[in-house]
Structure formats: structure tokens, C-alpha cells
């Protein structure tokens, strides 16, 4: 995806606007019998924008209001069950950024989000939006983060407009050397399928090791264990992911 925007300060008042374009592509699914099925009906482009206004009431305290809107256009007009999945949606929220000390900063907000689908058989997907982030830096070498997010995710379950996903993440970064960083992360989440009895719980534990060969070249190794517990028979999954990547930057 890509983002283009601008930010303007008027003394204590700040205005920020961004335009966003994102592309989501799903890989083919491999079935237990050895065959595979494609997920091309789930691929979509998203076009949208977000605007935020904020005002610095006190040093370290900046309340804000934010509004976002987007449209999602799928590669295929109908999904595998002949539902029209193109949609429009967005959110509105209010909150504040804060800095208690130089060691403890964060942001918290509450709002409302909704998504309407082209298919009249699908109900409007809506829900309470809560998001927060807290960053604690106990030492110059260690940073701890707590992050919670709410999102509306796509699904192909017949008659279900979408999935309301809430994630809660704890992450700790530690620099052993200037060139060696370790990252530990744990995530717990819930997925509620709207207009459906299905409900999932997500657990993920992850470890990363980042080796900074130079300012421009980083090598990253990752091991992750993902577990999904579902109240639907046969819907639970577990996976272990091992990745090795390279990051180039200027």
C-alpha cells in the first residue's frame, strides 16, 4: 500500500490529512487431502482517507478527533457463495495523546466504526472502536509496549458481513548491542463473526532477532507460534512460522 498526506501546525492546533491506497492478496489454501483452493475472490483494493485535528492543551497532553472513510473493491464481483463483497465504511473516534514523563508515553481513543456492503443480504457491520498504545522506556536499551486495536475484517462465510477483531499485544524490545536487538511479543485477540454464532480466540507468541550489519542493511530472524481456538467444530488451527528476512533502507 501507499500513503500521501500533509501536516500543518497552527500554533497549538494541528491538522493532518492522509490519502491511502492498499492492496490485499490472499494465497491459495492447501487442504488436508493434499488439494488446494484459490482465494482470488477475497483479493481487494482499498481506497480511502483519514483526517485528524488535535490541540495541545498542556505540554504532553494533546486531545484529538479523527475520521476515516474508505471503499473496498474486490477483483471478482461476487465471492464463492455469490455474495457481493464490495463495501464502503470508516470510523470516527476521539482521544488523546499523552506524555506522563519522557519514560512513559501513549495514546488512547474510543469511537464507532461501520461498514456497509453492496449485497442487500448482508447486514451493516458495526461496533465500538477502542484503541490504545502505551510505551514505557525503563532504560535506554529496553522498551516495553502495550497496544490494543479494533478492526473490521473480511470473510467469505455465507450470510456473514464481516468479523469484528480486537487484538491486545505486549511487546518488549532490548538492545544487547547497537547492532543486535531482540524482540519478544505476545498477542491475545477475539474475533466475533457478525450475524453468526461463531467466535474465535487468537493466541500468538513471537520472538525476533535483528542483526544490524550496517545502517542500510538489517537481517531479521523470526519464530512465531499462532493458535486459533474456535467454537466451530474443525475451525481451530495452530501454526509455527519461521522466517528470515533482509531490510534495506537509506
Please name every model-derived segment:
Residues 10-17, 59-65, 102-108, 140-146, ...:
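Repeated loop/turn-to-beta-strand initiation elements of outer-membrane beta-barrel proteins
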Residues 2-83:
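Solenoidal tandem-repeat scaffolds enriched in leucines and small polar residues
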Amino acid at each position: 500500500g501507499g500513503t500521501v498526506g500533509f501536516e500543518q501546525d497552527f500554533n497549538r492546533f494541528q491538522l493532518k490529512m492522509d490519502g491511502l491506497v492498499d492492496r490485499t492478496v490472499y494465497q491459495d489454501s492447501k487442504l488436508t487431502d493434499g488439494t488446494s483452493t484459490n482465494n482470488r475472490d477475497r483479493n481487494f483494493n482499498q481506497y480511502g482517507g483519514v483526517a485528524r485535528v488535535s490541540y495541545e492543551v498542556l505540554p504532553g497532553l494533546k486531545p484529538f478527533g479523527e475520521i476515516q472513510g474508505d471503499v473496498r473493491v474486490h477483483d471478482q464481483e461476487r465471492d464463492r457463495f455469490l455474495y457481493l463483497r464490495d463495501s464502503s465504511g470508516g470510523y470516527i473516534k476521539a482521544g488523546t495523546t499523552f506524555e506522563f514523563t519522557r519514560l512513559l508515553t501513549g495514546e488512547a481513543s474510543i469511537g464507532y466504526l461501520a461498514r456497509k456492503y453492496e449485497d442487500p443480504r448482508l447486514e451493516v457491520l458495526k461496533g465500538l472502536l477502542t484503541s490504545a498504545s502505551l510505551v514505557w522506556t525503563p532504560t535506554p536499551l529496553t522498551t516495553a509496549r502495550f497496544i490494543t486495536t479494533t478492526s473490521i475484517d473480511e470473510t467469505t462465510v455465507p450470510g456473514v458481513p464481516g468479523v469484528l477483531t480486537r487484538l491486545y499485544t505486549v511487546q518488549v524490545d532490548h538492545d544487547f548491542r547497537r547492532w543486535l536487538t531482540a524482540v519478544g511479543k505476545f498477542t491475545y485477540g477475539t474475533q466475533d463473526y457478525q450475524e453468526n454464532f461463531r467466535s474465535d480466540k487468537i493466541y500468538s507468541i513471537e520472538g525476533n532477532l535483528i542483526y544490524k550489519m550496517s545502517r542500510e542493511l538489517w537481517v531479521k530472524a523470526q519464530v512465531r507460534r499462532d493458535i486459533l481456538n474456535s467454537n466451530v467444530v474443525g475451525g481451530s488451527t495452530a501454526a509455527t512460522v519461521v522466517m528470515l528476512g533482509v531490510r534495506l533502507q537509506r
